[in-house]
Amino acid sequence: MNVYTEHGFASRAEYLLTLSDEYDLPLAVVELVASQLGDTEDFDGLLVELSSIRELRSYSI
């Protein structure tokens, strides 16, 4: 069992796809941020970054 299955996901890919849906962000954005942070940040720093990106996208000029 790995950290993703412990949290109810079949794989990291499934987890990132779920985050893409939850944060209403393109999967490519989620994958890019995840690759930059590394998998050790998947359940901490990644969530903070995705939340920040979602908030920034809510502003319009």
Language-model features, listed with the residues they occupy:
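N-terminal acidic leader/helix
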Residues: 1-32
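Short, charge-rich amphipathic interface segments used for partner binding and complex assembly
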Residues: 21-61
